[in-house]
Amino acid sequence: MKTTYVNATIVTMNEQNEVIENGYIIVENDQIIDVKSGEFANDFEVDEVIDMKGKWVLPGLVNTHTHVVMSLLRGIGDDMLLQPWLETRIWPLESQFTPELAVASTELGLLEMVKSGTTSFSDMFNPIGVDQDAIMETVSRSGMRAAVSRTLFSFGTKDDEKKAIEEAEKYVKRYYNESDMLTTMVAPHSPYTCSTELLEECARIAVENQTMVHIHLSETEREVRDIEAQYGKRPVEYAASCGLFKRPTVIAHGVVLNDDERAFLAEHDVRVAHNPNSNLKLGSGIANVKAMLEAGIKVGIATDSVASNNNLDMFEEMRIATLLQKGIHQDATALPVETALSLATKGAAEVIGMKQTGSLEAGKCADFITIDPSNKPHLQPADEVLSHLVYAASGKDISDVIINGKHVVWNGECKTLDEERIIFEASRYKRGLQR
């Protein structure tokens, strides 16, 4: 099936960050086969021509660190620091999860993400009370592209830890490269919730299965102090000593890094998922993204969970990410719009190992989103497209979402998830949680 999308302003995010003011995209099944400017002549004998009527078309957004199973916890535990937030709010509530509640929570997060323009994401979920196969089936049904990872902790006894490792290894073997749309990573939660033995086992699983690693690391000053006091090393050095960086690794946060650590991470292909809103809300600090990029670290923007954000709007994350770098460096040129967009599209895709998406070019997966600026005063005058996408747009502006060539959202309506049912069930299950 060949489809051509015509009369579009196309933000390609190719190597030149080219914006085509009047162009078209030809899609064959799940792949882009051509992106060109000008009027479309049906030389390709396409099956369908869809008039975009001047809409902006850009690559689907890529969220590099999420916890969609936590979506029912929005608004619980506001105005708290990370450690008490986890220990007194999040973990006690997660211990009450059932398989049905976990699916309802996941659906809510998926619906929010896809309707606001996210097409791919990398996720970590706490397996307590969760049917992992049901979660993966739910993500698959949404039509989104994802790496969904089972989180490991060293809670409980040594036998509990051994069982957690065994279950995680089975999960990795089951779902790594499950399909072109769905995969997983090895996901120890953090150095402060995992023993040395568990981290070493995670490194082994990643090496033996050739998977990536996803971990929270260097998120707060307290974490750095505690790990240094316990192990005599800062978190980066400690994680490296456990073997985690033998495989490409995504660290969520990286707020507290020094120059030597940034150089080390770049050398060992350790990527950073930057969560600006979450880091601000939890009082964790501001990651020095400018210094990361200058050191050669791959960086992708992320939202974290709705419990610490409190939304999954990647446009908002782009805007706050660039404004923060300008502010902390007192440099208005820091993180310009092209870079901010890259960190939410092609750069983010590279961070989580999904190079097949993130830009609109021949050979890439047909993952793209659209915005109609014609009826939106905040996007007018409409000629400064890149600026408006970073500084003025929001997830609420999304019209259409195409993932792998399929219309997942069209004219604002999600075709893969039942919005009315999901919102009803989210409220019902939330009422059952005991705070």
UniProtKB/Swiss-Prot annotation:
Cofactor note: Binds 1 zinc ion per subunit.
Transmembrane annotation, as ranges: none
InterPro entries the UniProt entry points to: Amidohydro-rel, Deaminase_MtaD/DadD, Metal-dep_hydrolase_composite, Metal_Hydrolase, MTA/SAH_deaminase
Named cofactor requirement(s): Zn(2+)
Catalytic reaction(s) noted: S-adenosyl-L-homocysteine + H2O + H(+) = S-inosyl-L-homocysteine + NH4(+); S-methyl-5'-thioadenosine + H2O + H(+) = S-methyl-5'-thioinosine + NH4(+)
GO molecular function: 5'-methylthioadenosine deaminase activity; adenosine deaminase activity; metal ion binding; S-adenosylhomocysteine deaminase activity
Record-listed substrate binding positions: 94, 150, 189, 219, 304
Protein residues bound to Zn(2+): 65, 67, 216, 304
Keywords: Hydrolase, Metal-binding, Zinc
EC code(s) of this entry: 3.5.4.28, 3.5.4.31
Keyword set includes Coiled coil: no
Pfam families: Amidohydro_1
HAMAP family named among the record's database cross-references: MTA_SAH_deamin (MF_01281)
PANTHER family with a match to the protein in the record: AMIDOHYDROLASE-RELATED DOMAIN-CONTAINING PROTEIN, AMINOHYDROLASE SSNA-RELATED
Alphabetized NCBIfam families for the sequence: PRK15493.1
Function text: Catalyzes the deamination of 5-methylthioadenosine and S-adenosyl-L-homocysteine into 5-methylthioinosine and S-inosyl-L-homocysteine, respectively. Is also able to deaminate adenosine.
Family: Belongs to the metallo-dependent hydrolases superfamily. MTA/SAH deaminase family.
Name of the protein in its database record: 5-methylthioadenosine/S-adenosylhomocysteine deaminase
Organism, scientific name: Bacillus cereus (strain ATCC 14579 / DSM 31 / CCUG 7414 / JCM 2152 / NBRC 15305 / NCIMB 9373 / NCTC 2599 / NRRL B-3711)
